[in-house]
UniProtKB/Swiss-Prot annotation:
It comes from Debaryomyces hansenii (strain ATCC 36239 / CBS 767 / BCRC 21394 / JCM 1990 / NBRC 0083 / IGC 2968). One of its GO terms (biological process) is rRNA processing. The lineage of its organism: Eukaryota, Fungi, Dikarya, Ascomycota, Saccharomycotina. ATP-dependent RNA helicase required for ribosome biogenesis. Involved in the release of U14 snoRNA in pre-ribosomal complexes. Required for pre-rRNA cleavage at site A2. ATP binds at A90, K91, T92, G93, S94, G95, K96, T97. Belongs to the DEAD box helicase family. DDX10/DBP4 subfamily. This is ATP-dependent RNA helicase DBP4. GO terms for molecular function: ATP binding; ATP hydrolysis activity; identical protein binding; RNA binding; RNA helicase activity.
Amino acid sequence: MGKKQNNRKVVKSQRKSHREKEEETLAKLQERIDAYDPVVDEKSISQFSDLPISEETARGLKEASFASLTDIQKKTIPISLKGEDVMGTAKTGSGKTLAFLIPTIESLIRNKITEYDGLAALIISPTRELAVQIFEVLVKIGKHNNFSAGLVTGGKDVKYEKERVSKMNILVGTPGRISQHLNESVGMETSNLQVLVLDEADRCLDMGFKKQIDNILGHLPPTRQTLLFSATQSDSVKDLARLSLANPKRVGISSDQELSATPESLEQYYIKIPLDEKLDVLWSFIKSHLKSKILVFFSSSKQVQYAYETFRTLQPGISLLKLYGRHKQTSRMETTMKFSQAQHACLFATDIVARGLDFPAIDWVVQIDCPEDAATYVHRVGRAARFGRAGKSLMMLLPSEENGMLKRLNNNKIELKFMNIKQKNKKTIRPQLQSLCFQDPMIKNLGQRAFISYFRSVYVQKDKDIFKIDELPSDKFARSLGLPGAPKIKFKGGSDNKEKKNMSRQLAALSKSNNEGDVVPEEDKKVRTKYDRMFERKNQTILSDHYLNLTGSKADTAEKSDDDDEDFMAVKRQDHELRDDELPDLSIPVSKRSAKKALSKKASVAGKGNANKLKFDDDGVAHAIYELEDEEDFKKQGDARVQKDTFLNKETELMNNADIEDKLTAKEKRQEKKRKRKEMEKNMRQESDDEDENIQTVVSIGGDDIDLDRDLEHSSADEDVPEPKKPKWFDNDKNVNKDEDDGVVEYDEPQTLEDLEALTSKLLEH
């Protein structure tokens, strides 16, 4: 017993000393933070090791190869460590992710958050890819801390997340899924929340997450630290900051230090090109940059699919990838990882990639379609030249888009250089695209959908000084896609389509989910047969509504009895003038006898008179078949004798022509009849020759019995009358005389047994 008590005392003393050491370390750390003056100490800080942060965080930053601080990190991290709200603005690729992750981890360390305290930090990003990237950086720099972190995004199992979300200290996710967990997950408690981070806040609002963000803010306690970061500052972002931040410190790179919103190491070019030559130029560009890492932006997912499928079939000699919003989560993650790890590759993508994602070492950012505004341009080209690295961008502008877009960019202090395209380097792929569309119906369908989606994307744009849909050559663009003609397009509400395009598709799915968070699939539409429609059919007679009112239930009449007194002496309808469409049709029969008479065809025809046949001339004017002329009209045509002679000559000519045709017809009929007769005679001769060849001679020797069956087999079944017998050899005197004269005896072939005996006796005599 004594040893156990001594061991317990030792353990308690060790725990006490450990706690005292931690408290002492935290106290010193807090002193450093309180003593920090952003105005004085900002220039002296250049490394992460100079910051007043914990040893665990500093070790994680060192192992992740993060050493130097960027401008936004120098200004933001010390203020955030003091616990103040921050509204940060900086250009893309400036290191905003570490600017809010380090203060988040340090805040949890100073508040002594453990795994039993529940949710303490919430980080919200607009896209799944950006959330995954933030989570990966968080794991790298915070692996030496004892916090639990989780990632919740759309496209994953909600039940699996609900079972574990209550045990997380740091939660990274998209607005839609976080809002769903706050509404449905029982164990998700936010009363102990310390830090809220909104990354790419302007993009969250543009994608239609305003309601979800408002819902999230309603669940969070007011005593929290809020960090809001964005590359641009819009009115909606300022409104959000006013609602969620308390006395925020606005941090950003000043205009004196930054001439434009794009990185200084980025070389920016643009070319002026017709719409129908964009794919040819893109193909030529890829073929001439096979040893580069290229990111190509399109305005719609349909264009991404068409370009990917056609270029993949033509095999440019570089790895091709595609990424757009309708991809499944696993496929999107796989594509993101492949492009990040690839040294030379080309990624076709939509604006889903334009925000926050950090792809290492991108050489070229190519914008096939004009961005909707200057902010979108900044985010697109910001994928290259990140963290001071070199990079280039190329934007293709139509002649109708050049002046307006360059004016918008100049207003934001963004200058682009014009690039000429050498015709010898440009290769056309229009014949190959036409061949692919002709051979593969799937590619043809993708081309049609790409055509329609491009025109719709131009139609929904608000800046009509840049996007002029009336000046787009639709027929030439359709032929450049390999299509035989321009498909028909129906345009509907532009503003509604714009909101639907930017809104997250996961929100629509979440609105249809049940209490368990599972998305309820829509019921398949059943095939309705004619019998189903027959049983669903109601009374179609003209008295149906009136009949239902007359045969209403007693309960209905009882309920309406109380209202009858209120309607007493009430004006139902004021006197007014009747319109023509309100007058009744008196021609409709009102009695059964009249209706029966109207259905009788004979009775209906009797009162209508005789029918008149009409003929129509070339102008569509109706004339009677026989029209009588007046005497005056007849005299206007000339003398009667002249008219008579003209009529006779005309009719004579018609008769002569008809006579020639009749003679030719008669001649053809005679020749045809003669040909058939000759053919019939020829067939008869062939049949007779075949019968003669089939005749066989049978000689029976010995025995008195005659084989009648064998004789019948060789007899003709068609012979009704037997042929006359030929004269015998001994009855023919001419043969005898001839034999005597020539010395040669000729005998007929014996046909019967008697002939054979006679022949034998004759031979014996000779």
